[in-house]
Amino acid sequence: MGYVMKLLVAFLTLAFAFEGYLMPNTAAPNPPEEGYLLVANKGTEAMGIIDPSAGRQIAEVAEGGTTGHEIAASPDGRTAYVPIYGNSGVGKPGTDGRNMAVIDLASRKVVGNVDFGKGVRPHCAVFGPKDGMLYVTTELDKAVAVIDPKTLKIVGSVPTGQPESHMLAISPDGKRGYTANVGPGTISVLDMENRKALGVIPVSKEIQRIALSTDGKLIFTSDQTKPQLAVIDSSSREIKNWIPLPGLGYGTAATPDGRWLVVAVRTANKVAVVDLHRMQVAHVIDVPAAPQEVLVRPDGQMAYVSCDASKKVAAIRTSDWGVDKLVDAGPGADGLAWAGR
């Protein structure tokens, strides 16, 4: 009887396992992360607030200056920070912005201001992942300003040693910073803890934008002289790969699982999805004119791409890389930020 019972138990175990193999997984997908998508509408000198679930821009907040290109949202999702850059593009003649607007998202009003004391063309604002400080590129100072968001005081700076330090990425541990220096075509490597420059990585004659892999081991920037993406090893500071693109790349963002890099291909009105395991483009998606910046939602389910010339933001599903919806934004839609709720 004991032997028969053992056979019966073994049979039932296999039967249940086989049934589980055949039965589809009926578990409900994770609900989408709640929050607002913030967009810098350069043409109206205002920050747009998009409700992603409704698929529309529900408000605009005047920034009070000419003009914000990028946005940072506070970790608690209550406040937005918009550096006021000026009326020109990077390296071009024009006005030199000297302040950053602070916007309360609940009241949708400007509630604070950071004055840099002179025209510095403040551009990209990034929260430190560990220290809670707000870091802002100040191009004309060849530096990154360190701001305490609680007091709105400038408490330090990190020199980049290069002109046109336009965009900033910070490693997940908060120890290293990397700036994309457009005109020189270089990347500055920064010691964020000791607030000093560690070196410069030459990439091309001109580059745009910068992003890191989720583990901080790879740096990505788009060559502006050839349709290719530079992949740089952050430890050796050497170019590891050049990935061909269907046009000149621009903004990039990695998915939270570390598998994909989403690349705006500005000159081709497309988005390229790079497989980071194979280091090659796996998907190409048509989007409206002049895709600029890419933001992957924290839950990884959606990628948002601002499209400057078309007043649109494309929402792209990461499950099948299809365009979920096109959201009407403002003219010159550029910088993006996610304000979680």
Task: For the regions a language model picked out, list residue spans one by one.
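Positively charged n-region of N-terminal signal peptides that target proteins for export
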Residues: 1-8
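Predominantly soluble domains enriched in secretory-pathway, periplasmic, or organellar proteins
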Residues: 12-341
